[in-house]
Amino acid sequence: MSVTSQTSSSGSAAVSDCHRGIIDISGPVPGYEWEPSMTTEPVRGRVWTITDGVFRTLAIEGDTGVIAVDTFWSPGSARQYRRALQSHFPRKPVHTIIYTHDHLDHTGFGADFAPDADQILAHELTAEVIARRSSDGQLPATRTWSGERLEVSIDGAEFELIYPGPTHGTGNTALYFPNERFLYMADTVFTGPTYNIVPDFLWTSWIPNTRRLLGLDWDLYVPGHFWRLSRREFEADFELWDATAACALDALRAGVDIDNFADVKKFTYERMDEPFGSRTFRFDEFAAINVLTHMVHYQTGGWGLRDYEPYSNEPFKTTLPQRLGSPL
């Protein structure tokens, strides 16, 4: 969608009327108005995946309506997400939104996507951040859950929500479909090191907590970015991050100057290029940045209490201890 800045009678540019998240600036936000094209593809069973080529999410077809996961990253992409679902399910409105975590680029624009949804379900940790933030366009949760696991039965669809502990963002929740044997999670595992530079990756706990999901029975992983992965590709991402952390520690031991990125990059290539460089998506762009991020973590001690919450090495098992029914 093209964006045109309208001018008021006084000659000054009018402020864009789209939802603005927490961007507190005067003038239009053209990036938020842009409406990227969307691709909708079947996954397994009742589940579909929708992507703009970078961001990816799920929609679950119910008997009478649609259960949508997240809202996409901007007002424009949220509107396109809505249109994609309307095109594929013209007689089934979105009645439920499930939030994976609090970040605005995934759950920030429900007001543009499905303002009339009957319910928005989120982990209580996610819901608390959203309520306190009061971001323009991010709708508050109407139903919350707590703990690690919740079986969900909504409108004929059944799946499980799993909060493995602190990983990235707040309350980041995986969706597990035991009958279809696949898993979805936003912003933790995907091909390459692309976005793990985002500040609130909790380096102490995110790898052991996310690894717990390997205890479940699944062979397909749908990430919140880029393309689907096999179970082996999911495991390979941890190998990359274990090597990244080890490289950062070795760099500190070797006296590499944390303030000299050229030296950090040189050290990263010496240690990681041979095993990972040619087979890792966007390695050249992000590998050294992530080594630097780990170095800062080790040097500063991390994110305080958030980075030192207890975590578990106990794998999840395919059991369903708690159930959430739906009034729908």
Swiss-Prot record:
InterPro entries: Metallo-B-lactamas, NDM-1-like, RibonucZ/Hydroxyglut_hydro. Keywords: Hydrolase, Metal-binding, Zinc. GO terms for molecular function: ether hydrolase activity; zinc ion binding. Zn(2+) 1 binds at H101, H103, H168. Its EC number is 3.3.2.14. Residues 1-9 form a propeptide. It comes from the Bacteria. Binds 2 Zn(2+) ions per subunit. Its cofactor is Zn(2+). Induction: Constitutively expressed. It holds the Pfam family Lactamase_B. It catalyses: 2,4-dinitroanisole + H2O = 2,4-dinitrophenol + methanol + H(+). Zn(2+) 2 binds at D105, H225, C247. PANTHER family: ACYL-COENZYME A THIOESTERASE MBLAC2, METALLO-BETA-LACTAMASE DOMAIN-CONTAINING. Involved in the degradation of 2,4-dinitroanisole (DNAN), an insensitive munition ingredient used in explosive formulations as a replacement for 2,4,6-trinitrotoluene (TNT). Catalyzes the removal of the methyl group from 2,4-dinitroanisole (DNAN) to yield 2,4-dinitrophenol (2,4-DNP) and methanol. Part of the complex DnhAB composed of the 2,4-dinitroanisole O-demethylase alpha (DnhA) and beta (DnhB) subunits. Unlike other known O-demethylases, it does not require oxygen or electron donors. Belongs to the metallo-beta-lactamase superfamily. This is 2,4-dinitroanisole O-demethylase subunit alpha. It comes from Nocardioides sp. (strain JS1661).
